[in-house]
Amino acid sequence: MNNLQTFIGLLEAEGELVRIAAPVSSDLEIAEIHRRVISAGGPALLFENIKGSDFPAATNLFGTSRRVDLAFGKRPDQFLKELVKIAEELPTLSPRKLWSHRRLAREGLKVGLRTVRDGPVLACRQPSPNLERLPLIKTWPEDGGHFVTLPLVYTEHPITGQHNLGMYRIQRHDTCTLGVHWQIQKGGGFHYHVAEKQDNALPLALFVGGPPSLILSAIAPLPEGVPELILTSLLQGSKVKRVRDPNGSLPLLAEAEFAIVGHVPPHTRKPEGPFGDHYGYYSLRHDYPVLEVNNVYHRRGAIFPATVVGKPPQEDFFLGNYIQELMAPLSRLVMPSIKAIWSYGETGYHCLSSIVIEERYPREAMKFAFRILGEDGGQLSLTKFLVVHDGEGLNLKDFRQVLEHVLARIQFETDLFVIANLAMDTLDYTGPAVNEGSKGILVGVGPPKRNLPVDFAGPLPKGASDVQTYCAGCLALSGPDYNRDPSYGQTLACDPAISKWPLIFLVDDASIVANNVRFL
């Protein structure tokens, strides 16, 4: 799948796309239509008549597991699994066995970058860019403006020349400038930091659209320094075509729908945000670098892809789960002592992850926990709460199973760790300041220490209005507001009605346990 328009054609042929010819506004209306359709499990949407825009826009392209499968197929998964298998067996592989994997070598020859003389993205150029004519969307009422929500931000390290392709939200400030939300632990932000120390502007190419694999590569949790375009090539099964920018220094992706090219000057910031984010609340307004746009290129008949984020599950939920499953074999190769990893899209991914380990000596579990939280590059180091357990036969995607396994084994005095004064995801506002906060580690390994109660029976604890079971051993309890009774938690902990339950959540509405997204 080498470009967006081929993918859109496939979706239409498969009955997975609806064209909307009626005039619509990019100011909240497209986003609301998108939200209603995705919540109903509906099709991808192609908005052909957007008020004030010269281009159509497509949303919900990846809003179901089936459409994700149509975008990428089985090849990437099969290729990576075979590659990892060879890497694991390499020391003992006989020449005959190695020869049996020759198909993989042929596939490997297709991986890489290829420079071409011309490309569709150069078909049209706007010498005097007017970003107001592009269908950037405003998705939530309190958003600070209109955003590129599927941006592919390409930069090169000012010293090494190594490239980075990342997805960092982009806000339109005016007709020729954009805000670049380089949050913590982002490769493009590291490039800008180096350029700024040299008092130099950083060249930047913002691509919109292109092969679907570009989007997946931009969000993949790759270690710093691993080139995203190589993953793109691997996913699509052919070399990524690049073309020289006749008016700039960076290469352009030949099959992109749009290339918005400019530079980010040093020591320049403008307010960016607020933005309704994937955690389900607004990230606030902060100062961020500014992209000064020099040129806008686009292919003929260009389509502007977009998405809408918010409380999960949204479109990024399906992409996030796919990339986790795809990268699982590589994770086991890089971290062989960790048998499995899963981050929970219901929480926005960074908030909650669990890993499966085998503890060979007391407290070894903490070594594995620090291995995850200390991951060099990638996004695992931003994990807020990590559950470490030895439930190898569990379905990691079912957090109830994981939590029951842990609660049967945990001693909270020795197995719950809260580490303060750490760097946090920029979008996490639970700490004392931006990028600051605490992390938690919960360990449940070894033989069971207790039998977990399954159903709550008996009178409600004093002051409680409702009790619901989330899983064996875990209750949600509706209690008084903290401002009304700040000591209620201490009172509840001494109530014999809950003495057999190892974990109780004191909440406003205990019925949230029925919905994993609301509860987690």
Functional labels for PLM-detected ranges:
Residues 1-275, 280-290, 294-505, 511, ...:
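Extended, highly charged
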